[in-house]
């Protein structure tokens, strides 16, 4: 239903347009998928694009340093990394976790370390959200048919339910209706028919 596009084209633009957060209206934003190794992929996202830097150059050891921090601090690792960064108290951080269903999609019952990695990943988010003095925010996108799997994570599931938004599936006509109303421009009916035919033949477009 276009969750990723909605976040990146809509919410990110709004955030970058001086949206007020706990640490002012300046933001660092990253987006990643949990995949098979959510902690490692989080470290990759945190060490990319000067996310946690103001003027200094990132260190080549950042990824390894962050990974080590999570091993030592566990669920408080992200808070520790952020509080030691240049942007702490100066910028907000928005972390978009895309395709959160990756956590449940890949069978990991045969690998205890990978299963524990998933549990730690969820606890990292949980502990960070509950810390009111730290300006880290999360957007989590997940397929609706995986939502019930979050129920086994207790308070984490409860926290998500307080700010849950279901993005409805739009058919072609509804999609263009919303565009016309939101962006205030008209589209030739012939062009709409042509696009609809092309999309029905090649949905991947």
Regions found by a protein language model. Give the residues of each.
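Amphipathic helix/helix-loop-helix segment enriched in hydrophobic residues with interspersed Lys/Arg
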Residues: 1-205
């Amino acid at each position: 239903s276009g969750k990723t596009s909605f976040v990146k084209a809509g919410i990110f633009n709004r955030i970058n347009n001086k949206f007020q957060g706990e640490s002012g209206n300046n933001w660092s934003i990253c987006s990643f998928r949990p995949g098979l190794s959510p902690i490692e992929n989080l470290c990759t996202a945190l060490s990319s694009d000067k996310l946690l830097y103001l003027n200094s150059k990132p260190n080549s050891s950042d990824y390894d340093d962050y990974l080590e921090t999570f091993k030592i601090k566990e669920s408080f690792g992200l808070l520790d990394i952020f509080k030691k960064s240049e942007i702490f108290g100066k910028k907000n951080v928005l972390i978009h976790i895309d395709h959160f269903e990756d956590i449940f999609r890949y069978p990991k019952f045969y690998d205890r370390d990978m299963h524990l990695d998933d549990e730690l990943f969820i606890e990292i988010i949980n502990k960070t959200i509950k810390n009111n003095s730290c300006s880290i925010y999360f957007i989590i996108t997940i397929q609706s048919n995986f939502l019930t799997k979050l129920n086994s994570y207790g308070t984490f599931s409860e926290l998500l339910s307080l700010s849950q938004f279901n993005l409805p599936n739009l058919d072609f006509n509804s999609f263009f209706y919303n565009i016309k109303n939101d962006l205030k421009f008209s589209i030739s009916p012939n062009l709409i028919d042509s696009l609809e035919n092309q999309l029905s033949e090649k949905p991947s477009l």
